[in-house]
Amino acid sequence: MTTSEIATVLAWHDALNEQDFDTLVSLSSDDVEVGDAKGAAQGHTALLEWARSSGVKAEPGRMYVRDGIVVVEEAVTSAAGNSTAASAFRVVHDHVTSVFRHPDLASALAATELTEKDLAG
C-alpha cells in the first residue's frame, strides 16, 4: 500500500464533489478509462462528460489497496437519493488511469480480486 495512491484517489473524489474539473483532469491520465456495467469510455473528454452529467457526490469510506488498485466504498448522494456504491481505481505515477463504478463493495472487490487483507488503515 502506498500513501500516494490513496491520496490521489481522495483528491480525485474531492475534485469530483467540488466540480473542480481542472483538478479532476490533472489527476487523471490522458487516456483515463471511465466505466460501469453499461460500458466504458476513454480520455479526458469522456471523463468530463461523465463528471458534468453524473450529478453525484461520492464520499469515500473504507479503502482497499494493492499494487496500484484502489477500491473505495462510497456514500453516494444524487437527485435519486442516497445510496452506497463502490469504485475501483487504477493509479499509476499519481494519476488515475481507470475508474469503474460498481453497485456495491462486494462486486468491486470481486472484480479486482482485492480482499479484506487489503483494507487500508
Question: What does each of the following model-derived ranges do?
Answer:
Residues M1-G121:
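C-terminal and inter-domain tail/linker signature
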